[in-house]
Amino acid sequence: MNNPNIDSDELTALFTADTPLIDVRAPLEFILGSLPGSVNLPILNNEERALVGTTYKQQGSEAAVMLGHEMISGQAKQDRLQQWLDFIRQHPRTVLYCFRGGKRSQITQQWLKDAGVDRPLIIGGYKQARQFLINTIDRFSENHTLLVITGPTGSGKTQLIQEIRNSYPVLDIEALARHRGSAFGGMSLPQPTQIDFENQLAVNLLKLKQNYLFDPVVVEDESRHTGRVYLPASFFEHMRSSEIIWVDEPLNTRVDNIFGDYIVATPIGQAQQARRNTQPLSSATEIQEILCQQALLLFDKYASALQAISKKLGGVRFQEVSQDLENARSSFVNRNEIQSNKTWIEKLVRYYYDPLYLGSLQRRQVNPCFKGSRQAAIDYLRARKQHA
C-alpha cells in the first residue's frame, strides 16, 4: 500500500488526530524543540550529524551522503531500522520527519519500504510544520473569541475553568507551561522548551477551533511569562483585548484555596496524613520517611521562592514572612501540624500578590463584563451560554 506524503494542507488533520511521529533528526536538534506526538529515533546521532555537516560544507552533497551511508551500515543500520519498525508496529499510523523533509527522512522512508513498511513523511519537514503551527496561533488570535478569567491570587480561577469544561471550550495555559504562573508555581515536571510550549499551544488551538468553531474559549488571565516560557505576542495581545470576567473572593477564602493547593495537596499534607495514621509495619514507616523528606524539600523550595522575591517584599516583610515559614516548618516537623502555614500564606498574599495584581489591573484599566464570586461567575457563564 502506498502512503502519500503529508503536505501543508494535511497538517491540521495530522495534529488534531494526535498522529504518532518519528523525528529522525539528531538528539541535539530534538531537545531544542519538536512536533507534538514525536519520539526521537535519529538516523544520525549528534557526532555523525556533525561529521556529515562538515563534509557537506567542504566537499558537497554527494560526499556527505556517501559518508552517511558508510557510517550507518551493517549492524548500525539494522539497529536503527529495528527501532523504527518496533515503534511503527505499536503505532501503525506513524509519520516521519526530519528538518526540511530532505535526505534523512527520505532515506529512513526508503529503508522502511525495503523492509516492507511504507510510511509517509512530512513534506518540508519540521521547518514547514513549525511555521504552520506559528501561523495557527496568529490566525486563531485574529479570528477566535476569548473569555478571560481574572482575579487575585487564590480566588479559584483554575478551579472555575475546570468546572465549566462541560459548558465551554477551555484552554489551560498553566498546564501547557507546567507552571502555576507565580513565584511559587513550579510543578514537579520540568517546563517545556519555549518552542515545545508554542507547538503544544498551537495544537490545542487547532483542536479547539475544530471542535468549537463559534464558541468563545475560556482562558485564565496570565502575564506574558509563565515560569520560563512566554505567550506568543499575537495571542497575548488578543488576551489583553478580550472580555474579562473578574472572580472576587474574600481573603480568608483565598488563603484556604492556596493552603489546599500548596500544602494539603502536596507532600506536606500527604506526609501529615501518613504520620497521623501510623502503623507498626516497616513499609508504612518507610513511606512516611519518603513523604517527610519530600515535604521538607518542598519547604526548602518555598523558602527559595521567597528569597527570589525578597527585594520586592522589602527587608522587614521578607524577614517576617520567612520566620513564619520557618515556624510552619518546625510545627510540621515537631508536632505534625500544618495549619500554621496559613500565617505566611496570608501575609504573602497581602504583602506581595495583591499589590502586584491590583497594580497590573490599574495599568490595564480593566473593565470586566462580570465581577463576583467563583460560583457567581460560574452561574453567569452558564446563563450566558444558554442565551447565546
Curated annotation (Swiss-Prot):
Q: Name one GO biological process term.
A: tRNA wobble uridine modification
What EC number(s) has UniProt assigned to this enzyme? Answer: 2.9.1.3
Q: Give the residues annotated as coiled coil.
A: none
Active-site residues, record numbering mapped to chain: 98 (s-selanylcysteine intermediate)
User: Does the record bear Coiled coil in its keywords?
Assistant: no
State one Pfam family annotation: Rhodanese
Going by the UniProt record, its keywords in alphabetical order are: Selenium, Transferase
Source superkingdom: Bacteria
List the Gene Ontology MF annotations in alphabetical order.
transferase activity, transferring alkyl or aryl (other than methyl) groups; tRNA 2-selenouridine synthase activity
Which reactions are catalysed by this chain?
5-methylaminomethyl-2-thiouridine(34) in tRNA + selenophosphate + (2E)-geranyl diphosphate + H2O + H(+) = 5-methylaminomethyl-2-selenouridine(34) in tRNA + (2E)-thiogeraniol + phosphate + diphosphate; 5-methylaminomethyl-2-thiouridine(34) in tRNA + (2E)-geranyl diphosphate = 5-methylaminomethyl-S-(2E)-geranyl-thiouridine(34) in tRNA + diphosphate; 5-methylaminomethyl-S-(2E)-geranyl-thiouridine(34) in tRNA + selenophosphate + H(+) = 5-methylaminomethyl-2-(Se-phospho)selenouridine(34) in tRNA + (2E)-thiogeraniol; 5-methylaminomethyl-2-(Se-phospho)selenouridine(34) in tRNA + H2O = 5-methylaminomethyl-2-selenouridine(34) in tRNA + phosphate
Q: Which residues form the Rhodanese domain?
A: 15-138
* Top EC class for this record: transferase
Family the UniProt entry places it in? Belongs to the SelU family.
- Classification via HAMAP family: tRNA_sel_U_synth (MF_01622)
What this chain does, per the record? Involved in the post-transcriptional modification of the uridine at the wobble position (U34) of tRNA(Lys), tRNA(Glu) and tRNA(Gln). Catalyzes the conversion of 2-thiouridine (S2U-RNA) to 2-selenouridine (Se2U-RNA). Acts in a two-step process involving geranylation of 2-thiouridine (S2U) to S-geranyl-2-thiouridine (geS2U) and subsequent selenation of the latter derivative to 2-selenouridine (Se2U) in the tRNA chain.
- What is said about its interaction partners and assembly? Monomer.
Write down the PANTHER family for this protein, in alphabetical order: TRNA 2-SELENOURIDINE SYNTHASE
Give the protein name, as stated in the record.
tRNA 2-selenouridine synthase
Per the UniProt record, the source organism is: Nitrosomonas eutropha (strain DSM 101675 / C91 / Nm57)
Q: Tell me what gene encodes this.
A: selU
